[in-house]
Structures are given as C-alpha cells and as structure tokens.
Amino acid sequence: MNAPGTKAVGSWSGGRYLRFGEAIEPERLEAMLHPGDGIDTVLTADAYGQGEADELLGRALVGVDRDGFSLIGAVGHDFYEGERQGPRGFPRFTDPALRTPDEYAGYLRMAVERSLERLGQDRFDLLLLHNPDRTGYESEAVWEGMAALRQAGLTGSIGVAPGPANGFTLDLVRCFERFGDRIDWAMIILNPLEPWPGELSLDAAARQGVRVITRVVDYGGIFWDDVTPETELPTGDHRAFRPEGWIAEGRAKLDRLRPTAGCARSH
C-alpha cells in the first residue's frame, strides 16, 4: 500500500462536481488527475456526480502503474437509496430512515466495491468516512465496518473526513478518543487564514497517532493570488456562500504575509 504524499489532487477540482471554479472539459480534468509531475496522490468521493467523478478518475488512471500512486477514496453519502436533500446533498448512510446499525457494514462494503469498480481498481490506499453525522462519529458499528474493509484488503488504511468547517471539533476529538486505535488518518480544513476549528483537533490526533491531511489549504483560492473582490464567481460556486467580504479580508491578510513569504502582489 502507498501512503498519501505531501501533495494531492482531487476529483472535486475542475468545477464539474462541486462547483469550485469554472467547469472544465472532462478530457482536461482527466489530464490534470493523471498521477505524475510530483503529484502522485489522487482523491475522490463516490458521491461526487453520483459516481461520475470515480469514473472520470478511473479513466485518468488507465495504464498507470498501481505502485506509482496513492489512491484515496471516501464514502458515506447514500445516493443509492437516499434522496437528494437540496443543497445538503444526499443523506448519510447512517440515517435511521435508510438502515439500522447492523446494516452499516454491509452498506460500507457495497459502496466501496462499487466505487473501486468505477475506478477500475482493486483497492484504496486510504478510505475516508465522508462528512459523517453524529452517528458516524460515535457508532461502534460504523468503525467496525470501516476496520473490516481494511482487514479485507479493500483499503490499506482508514480515516475520517469531517464536513463543513463549523462544529466538527468536539465530535472529531471524541471520535479519536473512542476509535483512535482503528483510525489511521483524518482530513480536516486547515490553512493560515482558517486555523479554526481544525487546529483544535490536532493535539487529540497526535495523542492517538492519527495522521492528518489538510484541505482547503489555499483558502478558497486566495493563496493563488488570482482571486480578487472583482472576481465573478460562477453561478452556484460554493465559495459564494462564504461570509460577505471574505475575499477582501483575505486579500488584506495576504498582503500582510507577503514580506514573510518574499513575494510581491501579482495584480
């Protein structure tokens, strides 16, 4: 199994599945997701495009030596039996309206096997529990099911990927404390302009030996230095739901960081 590298690219990029930036052509996104040029870790989630992101990444991986890249997957939103709940997306598989705890392991195995089939692969290097609800954080049955997937060889390691930035800290810390002997990784929102609440969980992760992947490291594109208050975000772009004025405020903070970073304003 290949551990995640220090840099990664995910199938949510390219504006096709999560409306982050301008939607690019599938062929261009496939080329971007093709491992190589120093980025050999690729991530996907089965809920993106209801499996379409898996399929696109699968095309990008055709012919690539399996030992030459790290593959990270994520499952948790049930688009097989659940109905989309507007902007909240599909319900978690732990929704009591969908199944009982004794069915969690079966769902997880089914979801992972179907995701791997779409990807054209036989295993993940890391499998994440995607945007868990309270049950996902606290249920023994959930983490027994996740550990069983590792035991079965469908993934080399397992972890958790909390959802929106607000409100996950205490749930995540408790999850580490209860199931840290089983959890290998956590993927959290963390960057210099958005330290809260991600950094509040770092000590708990360290105590349990849980390794951390950070996401949204560019603060919605601010650190690329090409997002300005005049930037027109595409319709439905999820960055448009951030608080009003976040771009101007982020740019002002970025300017204060320039002397330390040794870079000049690009605009």
What positions do the PLM features span?
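Short, flexible, mixed-charge acidic loops at enzyme active sites
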Residues: 22-23, 82-91, 226-233
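Active-site mouth loops of central-metabolism enzymes
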Residues: 13-26, 93-109, 130-136, 165
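A structural motif
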Residues: 39, 121-124, 155, 183
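N-terminal binding-site loop/beta-alpha segment at the start of enzyme catalytic domains
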Residues: 1-73, 77-81
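Short, acidic/polar
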Residues: 22-36, 101-119, 165-176
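Beta/alpha (TIM)-barrel catalytic core signal, keyed to glycine-rich beta->alpha loops juxtaposed to Asp/Glu
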Residues: 25-28, 131-267
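Active-site groove signature of glycoside hydrolases
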Residues: 114-138
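Conserved, mostly hydrophobic/aromatic
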Residues: 9, 42, 57, 71, ...
